[in-house]
Amino acid sequence: MKEQFKSGFVAVVGRPNVGKSTLINRIIRQKVTIVSDKAQTTRNKILCIHTDDECQIIFLDTPGIHKPKHKLGRFMDDAAFSALHDIDAALFLVAADEKRGPGDMFVLNKVKDAGVPVFLVINKTDKVDKKKIPAVIADYSQLYDFAGVIPVSALNGDNVDIVTDELKKILQPGPKYFPDDMITDQPERLLVSEIVREKLLRATREEVPHAVAVFTEEMTKRDNDKVYIRVTVYVERESQKRIVIGKDGAVLKEIGRYARTEIEQLLGSNVFLDIWVKVKPDWRNKTAALNEFGYKDE
């Protein structure tokens, strides 16, 4: 007899920069959430949808849980904690190449309270000697009775299929919540903003990334079938604006070039990308600015 179709919501949690977005992109087999080596890249809770013949798994990609330093940080933590409500399972990600720290313990204590099966996913196994992985497993396994332990490399795909296989075992029969071809709940404008923000994170220095907000002001299809997109990058200081623009506009041109290529792949159309940089002092601590940029409480 054919097994019933299964579905469920799975929170992906961990401290900043353990590879949550990279893992989800690998599972979905398409880039849905932005990836950067800067911590706390993901700012909103994002639904990412995996559908196959047997199940539909809705992953909740969350901001890395951390001690907030401003209103934006508190919003990010709230988004991460809210993902732990009404879920069917959780993936607790840790990094194989880093020692267990207070941040990992803080996240684990939060996810334990959700009362659902929790899988320990040890990411970045490509960065360590394979002989060291059993010790990492033993270190975390003493802390909690995990539903399963899965060492993976989200970067190169090692063991990633095991994640979905293990989730299928514990999910209950349920409906398809989303169409087969839907992979995220994020609108195109937000995806465009996130692509630009990702390229900016990669192109700028350490002092800029977390002071940046990117907002897509306009998306209009022109007569020549080219999509005109106007994006505004907000920073907090004039010095940051100069860094983003670069000498003779070189940095901004680089950001625009790489972002345009990816946006054209997303939209399937030629794109004219118009990026502006503006200063909005201390926007991360201003509720009105956070709401304007889409960081709103649910």
Labelled PLM ranges:
Residues D61, N123, S153:
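Active-site glycine-centered loops adjacent to acidic/histidine catalytic or metal-binding residues
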Residues M1-A89, V94:
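Conserved G1/Walker A P-loop phosphate-binding module
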Residues G19, N159, V251:
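Conserved glycine(s) of the Walker
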Residues Q30, I49-D53, P68, A83, ...:
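Conserved, well-folded catalytic cores of nucleic-acid-processing
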Residues T42, I65-K67, K99-R100, V128-D129, ...:
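Catalytic P-loop NTPase motifs of RecA-like helicase/translocase cores
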Residues P117, D126-T184, E188:
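Canonical P-loop GTPase G-domain recognition
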Residues H50-Q56, F75-V149, A203, T220-D223:
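Conserved C-terminal guanine-recognition region of P-loop GTPase G domains, centered on the G4
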Residues E188-E298:
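P-loop NTP-binding site
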